[in-house]
From Swiss-Prot:
This protein's name: Peroxisome biogenesis protein 19-1
Recorded coiled-coil stretches: 17-49
Modifications after synthesis and translation: May be farnesylated.
Annotated compartments: Cytoplasm; Peroxisome membrane
């Protein structure tokens, strides 16, 4: 009788243990599924920017679409770290643009211009949402003072290159490069006639995303060491937590 009672108790304990294991596994599975669903949702809501070298304008945040509401910039350490990285990479971008421009800025203006950019950026960080900060920074980097001369240098080489290479290019590539040239000309016209029309400038740069990189021959002729995809990769996520900070 005692043995029977002990066996029943053992079976009850084993059953309870099995139920506990099932409950624990089910809880872990549900927790994992919830985390995966949250990650999937976050990725769908976030505007991901291309990380590789894709083309003129590639990496510009799409200001025509609304992101996840208005986000306030955190005042934690990673913001300061991101700003430090942004300062250095912005300086490199400006210097790269100067290297391909026939009308170079005085050397003394270089660091001062970059510091002005970042000072404005830091001032905004404590008071505005991320989308506004990104837009302000892009307006600075895409301004006439920074981008007009390099775009003139670039556009001036297209007519000859298109004529010399039309026979060897596919119809698709020729059409793409021709559209690229058209957009560069449009951008230069805005710089000459409406230099403060930042929304138009940004709209044209957005369209350039679809045209890829400029012809490698032209890039090598202007400055083989400069990456045209460095003209503006900025994302709100970079200021929030990303360890990799990049400008276009």
């Amino acid at each position: 009788m005692a043995n029977s009672h002990t066996d029943d108790l053992d079976e009850l304990l084993d059953s309870a243990l099995d139920d506990f294991k099932d409950l624990n596994l089910s809880h872990q599975r549900n927790q994992r599924e919830a985390q995966e669903e949250e990650e999937k949702k976050r990725k769908e809501e976030t505007v991901l920017l291309p990380s590789g070298v894709q083309g003129l304008g590639m990496g510009l945040p799409d200001m025509r679409s609304k992101k996840r509401g208005k986000q306030k910039v955190s005042k934690e350490d990673h913001v300061a770290e991101a700003l430090d990285k942004l300062r250095e990479q912005t300086r490199e971008t400006v210097k790269g643009l100067e290297s391909i421009s026939s009308k170079q800025l005085p050397a003394s203006d270089d660091d001062g211009m970059v510091e002005d950019f970042l000072k404005q950026f830091e001032d905004l960080a404590g008071s505005k949402d991320l989308e506004s900060i990104v837009e302000t920074m892009m307006q600075q980097l895409l301004s006439k003072d920074i981008l007009h001369e390099p775009m003139k240098e670039l556009g001036a080489r297209y007519p000859k290159w298109l004529k010399e290479n039309e026979a060897s290019l596919s119809k698709e590539d020729y059409k793409r490069y021709s559209q690229q040239y058209k957009l560069i000309e449009e951008l230069n016209a805005v710089y000459e006639n409406e230099p403060n029309n930042s929304s138009k400038i940004m709209e044209i740069m957005q369209k350039m995303q679809e045209c890829g990189q400029p012809p490698s021959d032209i890039v090598k002729e202007i400055d083989p060491g400069f990456d045209f995809a460095s003209l503006g990769q900025i994302s709100p996520e970079m200021l929030e937590s990303s360890p990799n900070c990049c400008i276009m």
